[in-house]
Amino acid sequence: GIKIAYPSNGADLKGLLKAAYYDPNPVVILEHKGLYWSKVKGTDAARVNEPSEDYILPFGKANIVQEIWEQETNETITVITYGMGVHWALNASTTMKNQVEIIDLRTLYPIDEEAIFKSVKKAKKCLVVTEEPTNNSFARSLAGLIQEICFKYLDAPVMVIGSENMPAIPLNSTLEFTMIPNADKVRLKMEELLEY
């Protein structure tokens, strides 16, 4: 019965916290410290107006942050992410907004499979963005599920971008920057997938 949430902005955090309060089962809410006061460059989208006092966000309901229409002539992709990955994807897609649909999962369990599969079938290509090392990760598992369910709709393999597979985050800031994804790395992966 455990639920896992990972919001990308303060409004979602408030709604998920209230949902956790009313849920009879255990809930784990993860949050990225870089999103506090939007102090990391490129996270301006995390600054949102506080929702009403009664705002509750249901578990298992993803948010389409950037939507595209089905296109026959252009290559398109769906980016599935959560937390800080939402902001990397938004910043990475500034020059290709009409080709990139971005889905913020909000909750990792339960997961909104319906929204994911619908978007992937429309875009025909998928990139899963995470901050965790990709070996044996949630993102790899999700990519495998998408590949299995949406295989006949895909024009390319489902790709994953995450941290380098190292045992820990280095203390050296240069090494840390090298290890962790950012908007530039995500943009390069998007371009690679669009050209596939």
Regions found by a protein language model. Name each.
Residues 1-23, 163, 194:
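Conserved thiamine diphosphate
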Residues 33-196:
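Thiamine diphosphate
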Residues 1, 24-25, 97, 124:
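Residue-level detector of structured alpha->beta connecting loops
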Residues 29:
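Non-catalytic, usually N-terminal nucleic-acid engagement modules in DNA/RNA processing proteins
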